[in-house]
């Protein structure tokens, strides 16, 4: 289990400008929906964006604190369209 604040900090260490929204999908705090808005995604395809998020969350994924992720990764420009 991981807290929402801790998960957000992992992401912001890799992407300091990130706006992060996390929601618990099951009530167990290990199945999470994560929305990340960051300029770091500019010019990257979906797979590369997800890789960046997985790199940031490597530790809690490997130690089992996160079991499943539903990801949305956008730039702020993409939100405005």
Please place each PLM-identified region on the residue numbering.
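Short Gly/Pro-enriched loop/turn and capping motifs at secondary-structure junctions
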Residues: 27-29, 41, 78
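C-terminal structural segments of small proteins and small subunits
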Residues: 54-81
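A short interface-forming secondary-structure element
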Residues: 33-50
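Short loop/turn motifs enriched for small/polar and acidic residues
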Residues: 25, 37, 72-76
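N-proximal, solvent-exposed amphipathic alpha-helical segments enriched in charged/polar residues
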Residues: 1-19
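Short edge beta-strands and adjacent turn/loop segments
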Residues: 17-33
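Short, non-transmembrane amphipathic alpha-helical segments
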Residues: 7, 11, 47-64
């Amino acid at each position: 289990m991981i807290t929402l604040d801790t998960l957000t900090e992992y992401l912001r260490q890799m992407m300091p400008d990130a706006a992060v929204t996390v929601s618990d999908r099951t009530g167990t705090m290990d199945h999470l929906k994560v929305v990340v808005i960051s300029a770091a995604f500019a010019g990257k395809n979906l797979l590369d964006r997800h890789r960046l998020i997985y790199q940031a969350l490597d530790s809690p994924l490997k130690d089992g604190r996160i079991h499943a992720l539903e990801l949305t990764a956008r730039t702020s420009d993409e939100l405005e369209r």
